[in-house]
């Protein structure tokens, strides 16, 4: 439990690399950047996940639990869908790592449209829709620009963590860097946040 959000709180932020939408079953990189607050990169972990698979949750849990970074305090996710519709079970990440999870998104997701796409394209759509719905309440942090969900941490503390770990953009620095690194691995150069 986090009582006070310190300026140099240790966080790990995950994002995936870019991919072609018609490449279901292929692999894409998942990058986790470990930081002290918003300034010091402490380390990086990587895993490969399946486009439109169901392995991102296991990859995140393994990356955290098998790493040498034992002083992590919070997991930051850039959304809950990775590699297409490879959806994170945020409750399971919280339970199996013992770390609170904060999901950060810049655009408010259209859950109805996502559920419709899942029903249309996936035989296991019920499992995926359940994961979407179990991610927690979406809260607006910066009106029209930044939203978040929190599991295992109060929404007030989660907002503090987001603010303390952000530096060069609205999103936490660990997520910004994870995005840049993952897209550079997949495309040869980083993509705009």
Swiss-Prot record:
Signal peptide range: none
Top-level taxon of the source organism: Archaea
A Pfam family that the UniProt record links to this protein: DUF99
Family classification: Belongs to the UPF0215 family.
Name the record gives this protein: UPF0215 protein PH0071
Organism: Pyrococcus horikoshii (strain ATCC 700860 / DSM 12428 / JCM 9974 / NBRC 100139 / OT-3)
